[in-house]
């Protein structure tokens, strides 16, 4: 059995955390590499219009996918809790319910994404000269949305039981597939911007299939049986209970970021290309944030399920410190080398200037972003998903949109838009710190667990 090997409830805390987080970090590196390679490839082989079309994709894709990924987080909480408590029957039902739910919602997302892409892009104020290529890219991308949803479901299952290595192997292989197909479709065959999305769709399908094959074949309590894939009412209620707040949070925040992107679009395609190039680089800055957030959520869920309160208290401090220090180090390096980094995607001096300005306004505040995400991950692992939901909705959505709506009218500059991120990260960090220090979230988990 592999269950003991992947348990985070025993042994050295820092080793358990790092051994889980490091493969997640490497996996995210490769995922970000092939996302970035799309932008690099179309920017260098097609041109700035294509780069603008692809680079503005982040906020729209995140808006469409984030709700379903948030609900998948709920499945991870239920699975990690049951795994830590060694309640394998409950865990097994949750796993198969999560897969069934992912299949249903993945189809819904694919249909909605293909149908709504033109409307959303026009609402975002996408310039007319970029719009056709943007529509082509997004429609091809959303044709494979079901693969994205299922991959996240499978990875969520593996992470919940402490296995972060196998997703890494599959992501490395799919990243290689994506890069090869990008070069073939765009650079060699000259198929256009849509082919970059097709390459991404194929690679996501490959990674989802590899994860499924592993789950079907693994000799462990979390083994998947195709015949058992169905919606179990009790498991679904638990998954939605923990996942719906994260899904709503992700979607509404993504909508707020679409508003930010729409304001960036108003400065023209050079601003779109420059800021879009930054958004690809920003993904690398988020790597320590995302890997430690996932590690903390799984660590807290497993150890609270096993009633290891002492490990929880020690582990969260270590995880937060590592994430914040690494994020800020990346932020400082990003500030120092901003022009050189942006120029990797475009040789347009105007685009480089916009991207550099945007990056340098934001990047020194990455430690606050890391802190907010870590506390959110801890609260999700503790079954308190409504805490990050309300905090982030208030700070990253309502306040961010209000700030943008007012500030841009007063000072119509790109830096005004850029400041929306540091200001709202600061606000959420203050609220999270107060809750983290004052609330009895550890023992509340025990009471909720007994009721479940």
Whereabouts are the PLM-identified features?
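Short runs within selected transmembrane alpha-helices of multi-pass transporters and secretion channels
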Residues: 72, 141-159, 167-175, 196-211, ...
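Helix-terminus/linker motif at the lipid-water interface of multi-pass membrane proteins
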Residues: 33-51, 121-128, 184-191, 251-280, ...
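Small-residue hotspots at the loop-to-helix junctions and early N-terminal turns
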Residues: 48-59, 138, 197, 269-284, ...
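Small-residue-rich hydrophobic transmembrane alpha-helices
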Residues: 51-111, 148-167, 261, 274-338, ...
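Alpha-helical transmembrane segments of multipass membrane proteins
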Residues: 36-40, 111, 153-157, 179-184, ...
